[in-house]
Amino acid sequence: MILKRISILNYKNLEQVELNFSAKLNCFFGQNGMGKTNLLDAVYFLSFCKSAGNPIDSQNIRHEQDFFVIQGFYEAMDGTPEEIYCGMKRRSKKQFKRNKKEYSRLSDHIGFIPLVMVSPADSELIAGGSDERRRFMDVVISQYDKEYLDALIRYNKALVQRNTLLKSEQPIEEELFLVWEEMMAQAGEVVFRKREAFISEFIPIFQSFYSYISQDKEQVGLTYESHARNASLLEVLKESRVRDKIMGYSLRGIHKDELNMLLGDFPIKREGSQGQNKTYLVALKLAQFDFLKRTGSTVPLLLLDDIFDKLDASRVEQIVKLVAGDNFGQIFITDTNREHLDRILYKVGSDYKMFRVESGAINEMEEKER
């Protein structure tokens, strides 16, 4: 899938933006706080029906405005044009349309325009709680497996209902708990199996990217832990019910799964330097791209936001070689350091566009300015 053109009104600090893109490489150059990340976030919104940074849609409306609109004009691999529209008014439900037809369920859109974003916020994958790492798995698998996304939605709905019962001060019949526990178990087993299969296939791809960027200086790994492994999830939930009632929420289940991120045999959270952590995250996301490209029917979009920060020169050079190659389809990349972008452009050749970003205004640079 190629994003040919985007139109943005009142999204974050972007008042009015109309841009045509290169099918290969699009570079956005400017100081921090000017709107580079917001442009990438608008592209992200068109794939995931939400912002990467702020899930509260109304807070993404530009200050003192009543609405935002994002429109993307795409071209599929077979040349078919696709138009995606998102509009949001304050105190109103957002509208999401494909070719002018509104979606009845936003989840039906997930995976239609596969996308991978590498950004400074990825540091939470290492530094944050287990929910960040589960979300990573969810974002990848949901883009190519509708059964997974449906099971995850069913599980979370049942989890909310079970937690409501656990908080109740009134006596609750066991049969009522069983209704939601059986739904959690059924959906949770699907989620567990698919997460396990994904991680098993994903690990060697991830390790290959890390080895290339680090030039084999360190070994990395991933391990997946779940209460659903080696036990019936329904029995796990039933056995945990008494303790869960005391706490007022569900202590066990696939919503507590963990993806351990390792440098050597130890958690990278504890052992990794800033450069190693950044290398780990970049390799993780490039492996995500590669995995989605292998499993899907279309090449994902790749968004790279300030990707070179905290990396030494040799690792920057390895990433430049990767990004400038032919494996990554359409790329959108931001940086405050023009030199980084120029090195990529030198390797890519002629198929690129450079944009200058200043105070929410984004303008394509003329050839003589580049």
From Swiss-Prot:
Keywords on record: ATP-binding, Cytoplasm, DNA damage, DNA repair, DNA replication, DNA-binding, Nucleotide-binding, SOS response
Key word Acetylation present: no
Annotated signal peptide: none
Biological process per Gene Ontology, one example term: DNA replication
Subcellular location field: Cytoplasm
Any one GO cellular component localisation term in the record: cytoplasm
A Pfam family this chain is assigned to: SMC_N
Keyword Glycoprotein belongs to the record: no
Binding of ATP, residues: 30-37
Role description: The RecF protein is involved in DNA metabolism; it is required for DNA replication and normal SOS inducibility. RecF binds preferentially to single-stranded, linear DNA. It also seems to bind ATP.
Recorded family membership: Belongs to the RecF family.
Designated name of the protein: DNA replication and repair protein RecF
